[in-house]
């Protein structure tokens, strides 16, 4: 297969060549959901954990990779889609961080159409909101592989299992957890014993 492309950069007299990827080793994943659900924070964590960045950017500090526009820094929300690439086990993943505000719905629609899969982000505090529902519906309408990530489970008043049940109602009975947050595993075991 033909490599995706080669980019070079001159740094202090040295020529640096970016890693080449064949088309089968590239994935485009849209992050979608309601405003303030945690999409940009999730993108920052993925970039940091993959080694693409050496620091974890914070929205409040105005130093995230995806929200670099002065208006985004001022508002502390994404107003346009941004691409954040990283390598994971030899696969190039292009994250498309889409805005969550309805004013910028075109960015969400474009990001989902451009991606091959969608990661809908749902806040562990707010639950399944209208923005998450719309993102899920857009992903289904465009026949995209879809996963849901529940963010902010570590915050007070977050209820992972309530949100899981709500997702089954709003997204369909095929919703099934792949990973349960560590802080919730003991709660579910306790609830199960209490219900016997």
Question: What kind of feature is each model-predicted range?
Answer:
Residues 185-192:
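Conserved small/polar residues in nucleotide/adenosyl-binding loops
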Residues 179-181:
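P-loop NTPase motor core
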Residues 3-17:
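Short, Lys/Arg-enriched N-terminal segments with co-localized hydrophobic residues
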Residues 46, 114, 134-138, 142, ...:
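Short alpha-helical scaffold segments that flank and stabilize functional sites
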Residues 17-122, 126-128, 162, 171, ...:
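P-loop NTPase switch module centered on the Walker A-proximal segment
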Residues 13, 194-196:
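N-terminal cationic leader/targeting segments used for protein routing and processing
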Residues 124-174:
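Conserved C-terminal guanine-recognition region of P-loop GTPase G domains, centered on the G4
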């Amino acid at each position: 297969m033909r490599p995706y492309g080669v980019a070079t950069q001159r740094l202090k007299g040295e020529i640096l060549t970016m890693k080449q990827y064949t088309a089968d080793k590239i994935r485009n994943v849209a992050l979608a959901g309601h405003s303030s659900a945690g999409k940009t924070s999730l993108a920052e964590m993925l970039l940091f954990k993959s080694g693409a960045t050496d620091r974890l950017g914070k929205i409040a500090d105005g130093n995230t990779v995806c929200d670099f526009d002065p208006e985004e820094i001022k508002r502390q929300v994404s107003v346009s889609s941004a691409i954040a690439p990283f390598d994971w086990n030899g696969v190039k993943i292009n994250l498309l961080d889409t805005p969550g505000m309805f004013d910028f719905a075109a960015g969400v629609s474009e990001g989902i159409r451009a991606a091959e899969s969608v990661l809908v982000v749902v806040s562990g505090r707010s639950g399944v909101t209208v923005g998450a529902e719309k993102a899920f519906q857009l992903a289904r309408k465009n026949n995209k592989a879809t996963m849901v990530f529940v963010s902010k489970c570590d915050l007070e008043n977050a209820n992972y299992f309530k949100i899981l049940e709500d997702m089954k109602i709003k997204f369909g009975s095929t919703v099934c957890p792949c990973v349960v947050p560590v802080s919730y595993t003991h709660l579910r075991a306790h609830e199960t014993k209490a219900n016997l």
